Design a protein with these regions (language model features):
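Internal catalytic-core helix/loop-beta-alpha segment
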Residues: 110-126
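Structural scaffold elements adjacent to functional motifs in cytosolic proteins
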Residues: 132-134
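Rhodanese-like catalytic fold shared by cysteine-dependent sulfurtransferases
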Residues: 2-113, 137-175, 184-274
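Aromatic-flanked redox-active Cys/Sec active sites in thiol-based oxidoreductases
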Residues: 181
Length: 274
């Protein structure tokens, strides 16, 4: 019996928006009426949302959203879960729909070339000379990452511009394929690299989640961190054994939960000494 009754969707679009003071309560009221949970971030440069609810409610949300032509043609990431992975519904005004802290970066004007999941898969199969670059945070890469990927060990995405300055100079002439969970960070990260003089920068279209869906996840080691109470998904897009530490919110594997440095609701290996 399939108990995966909750539909999870995520999407984003870089699009100039005005009248945000009207849009925010409009989105909040609609999501509340549909009993959806998750987040919708609106900014002068676009929308970024992650929502969960019944299939009917999600369908009604999409009809509502697409009544505004600015929100048409948004590619969606869809997964299913047994339970609601979000605690509340929030619609927020943001300066940026993904925070980088660089006013000069606009993906509508400059961003890296997209490559499909199948193209990245073929690069691995053919052992191509390519630098696979992870743009996610350290607590995400610890859960899983692509085979031979360069991990920048970021604390936050805002650290990305500084981190690439420390990459080997020869990378500027190499073919680079970057990736993140769903694609939004790479829209900006690829522009940062192009402006910094990296000549051949591509981004994985749809991110890791689309790679799992389209290829089955070969060449991925581990699971993929997601920003909700499921914590991580495996290559079949199913929930895993990862949990959050109740105190510090670090993702914890089964092995870390078995550590003597873990006590439920009190401490974990990452916060016991803090």
């Amino acid at each position: 019996m399939n108990n995966l009754n909750v539909l999870n969707i995520a999407g984003y679009k870089f699009e100039p928006l005005d009248e945000l003071d009207v849009l925010i309560p409009k989105f909040q009221n609609k999501c509340d009426a549909l009993d959806l949970r998750g987040s919708v971030y609106l900014s002068p440069n676009g929308i970024n949302f992650s929502l969960a609810g019944s299939e009917e409610a999600i369908e009604q949300y999409l009809i509502f959203m697409e009544e505004d032509p600015r929100f048409l043609d948004i590619p969606l990431k869809k997964t299913y879960s047994e339970t609601q992975p979000f605690r509340r519904m929030k619609v927020r005004l943001k300066k940026e729909i993904i925070s980088l802290g660089r006013d000069d970066i606009n993906p509508r004007e400059l961003t890296g070339e997209y490559i499909s999941p199948q193209e990245l898969y073929a690069m691995y199969e053919n052992n191509e000379d390519v630098i696979v670059l992870d743009t996610r945070n350290e607590y995400e890469t610890r859960v899983g990452l692509f085979e031979n990927a360069v991990d920048l060990q970021l604390d936050t995405f805002r650290d990305f511009p500084q981190a690439i300055e420390e990459l080997p100079e020869e990378y500027k002439e190499k073919q680079i394929v970057m990736y993140c969970t769903g694609g939004i960070r790479c829209e900006k990260a690829s522009a940062v690299m192009l402006k910094a003089g990296f000549s051949n920068v591509k981004q994985l279209e749809g991110g890791v989640l689309d790679y799992f869906k389209e290829t089955g996840g070969k060449y991925w080691n581990g699971d993929c961190f997601v920003f909700d109470e499921r914590v991580a998904l495996d290559t079949n897009l199913k929930e895993t054994e990862y949990i959050y530490c109740f105190i510090c919110r670090e993702p914890l594997s089964a092995e870390e939960k078995a550590s003597p440095d873990f006590k439920i609701n009190e401490y974990c290996p990452y916060c016991i000494k803090k």
